Amino acid sequence: MIILVLLISYSFGKTQDGKDQLSPNYPYGKMNKDVNFNKPFTSAVDSYQIQQYAENGVFSANQENYVRAKCKTCCRVIFASDYNYKTNTQFTDEDDKKGDERYVMDMEFDDKRSVRFRNGGYEQNILLRPLKQGNELQFFEFAPYRMYTSYAIPKRVHDIRGGANEGATLIIWPKNPPLSDAPGTRNQRFVYVHPYPTEWYPEYNSTTKYTQNGKTVIKTLKWPTYKRHFYLPYRLDVDLCYQARKATDGRSTWTGNKNLNTTSKSYQIIASRCSATEARQIFIPVFA
């Protein structure tokens, strides 16, 4: 197993320009009259386009049923891709020694004030971007009910744009109540398969039933074999996992990102058929 050592500094509460992100003057929920999505813009805070500012409380975790500062099961984590974009292969120990650049899950914007209100067509991708010390947007949390929360924006979680379908991209989206059956809730639930022995997973080789085209299908579960993968349990007819796009792949675009250029190299993450050996599907959690 590759040992990934990262030196991480962390800042909280202030933006890159020194302003207080939690200021009561932040225009929560307001429409932005000066927005223009028809010309190029970047992920920088003074360029990124916002059609409507996010709702009040988006930066706060105090509405949860736990006290975040005292939570003993909350884990702040960076998810590093094990795919080396320099060699187009899986990272090796030698690659790490040489200092080849690691890409980690990050936002498509550079400052958390750029989080948008939940409007279709303006969804915001979670991208792979180079590791940057002090960037709080690269921190996530293992949350209850198989959800993955942005540490800097606790009301936003991993989601799949348009549902758990092949090629659909990973986004952030407002967190549904964990026990809710509201539409889209199951798209916010994922299984990170830790590299424990397969037999340690009680689900392995168990069966589940589902209906497809009016017929009952019995499926044998195999997802514990996809070590260090994010598995999408919502789909039962096919095993889907997160997968990073290649540098040569095109991007999925919509109104909110068709003219976006990130200030660093970035790659989308999509739902793809699971492969135990595909390096672009392997993610290493680095706890901090």
From Swiss-Prot:
Organism: Entamoeba histolytica (strain ATCC 30459 / HM-1:IMSS / ABRM)
Protein name in UniProt: Galactose/N-acetyl-D-galactosamine lectin light subunit 1
Signal peptide: 1-15
Sample GO molecular function, one term: carbohydrate binding
UniProt keyword annotation of Nucleotide-binding present: no
Places the protein is found: Cell membrane
Pfam family, one: Gal_GalNac_35kD
Record's subunit section: Heterodimer composed of a 170 kDa heavy subunit (hgl) and a 31/35 kDa light subunit (lgl); disulfide-linked.
Glycosylation site positions: N205, N261
Keyword Lipoprotein: no
Entry keyword set: Cell membrane, Disulfide bond, Glycoprotein, Lectin, Membrane, Signal
Function: Light subunit of a heterodimeric lectin; the heavy subunit binds galactose and N-acetyl-D-galactosamine of host glycoproteins and thus mediates adhesion to host cells.
Gene Ontology CC: plasma membrane
Membrane topology field: Peripheral membrane protein
